Amino acid sequence: MTDVDVAIVGGGFHGCSAALNLARRGRRVLVLERDHVARHASGVNAGGVRTLLRHEAEIPLALAAREIWHRIADEVGDDCGYHTVGQVAVATNEAGRERLAQRHARMIELGWRHEQWFEADALRRWMPTLTEAASGGLGAPDDGAASPFHTTMAFARAARAAGAEIREGCAVTAIEVAADGRWSLTTGRGVVHAEQVVNTAGAWGDRIAAMIGDPVPLRYFLPMMMITARVPRFLAPVVISADPPLSFKQTPTGGLLIGGGRPARGDRDGTPDRIDLAGLRASADTVRRLFPGLGDVPVLRAWSGTEGQFDDGIPVLGPSLRAERVWHAFGFCGHGFQLAPIVGRLLAELVIDGRASLPIEAFSLRRF
């Protein structure tokens, strides 16, 4: 049997970030990962470090996280492949322009200034090969992108260096209260007793929550990505869109990384994901409409990951409603990568201080 202060279920980016922050504050931490670190969404996402077009409830967290990203090498001893390249949402018709203009006005009304309006000529100075149909856009020049697998592994190494233990291939099959009042977690590699439990199990977070009595209406999806052959550099910022869905960037080596949330087919219990070629083609067509001079570029590889989501588009972050000393952070709806550095810090605050330094009420389980 293993005794720790905090057991973290899930060894993705959020779990490793929580482990790092807790270990640095002197807690004995054990991360229990069913597969291996960065196996699922944390290692295969688009790597966007985005404050742009965030849900209003997420903005304080996203801005705080961005400050950490800007000094990420100081945080974990690794640059995580991070570059401040900016992110931009482009409108190509009047309806899209109006939606983005309304968003900009709303941000100003709320007192946020991280999103900036760009007229068409300013967009083309930023992206010279952009379509002439572009009529305006909303951008966040201080946003950026990083390497997701690289980043998650860097946080895992830093957590271990700070004293945390990470057990891979160690699925949690039951959680109950032990005779001494502590939490008892049954795993494939023995029993773990912990004073507190943190659930960062991603697309399986609802199952861990159910073990301690919290019913959660989590769904899962399998967002796809693809990478092309290298082409001469033509694009600096990350280009995003909600309608149609798109996340598009040129990597430092010249390849085009295209995603945006179009799903593959499959399940979360071992059935191999089946890439939806029609969905990939639709994403590629969107890129070519935005950058019509691009021409034909070979696609080298396509893949998907498994992510949890809620109907309202924001995660669960906060305490269990049914049990003491249990904390949840999952269901980030495909945009949790950027938030993980601050989420780990907030989880450490919740565990140790009993409160978070940023507003998290909107992410409570009480909303369901």
Name these PLM-found stretches:
Residues 79-91, 114-120, 124-162, 264-269, ...:
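Helix-loop-beta segment of a Rossmann-like dinucleotide-binding subdomain
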Residues 138-195:
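Helical element adjacent to the flavin cofactor pocket in flavoenzyme catalytic cores
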Residues 191-236:
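Central helical "cap/lid" subdomain
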Residues 230-325:
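Active-site lid/adjacent beta-loop-alpha segment flanking the redox-cofactor pocket in flavoenzymes
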Residues 289-368:
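C-terminal catalytic lobe of FAD-dependent flavoproteins
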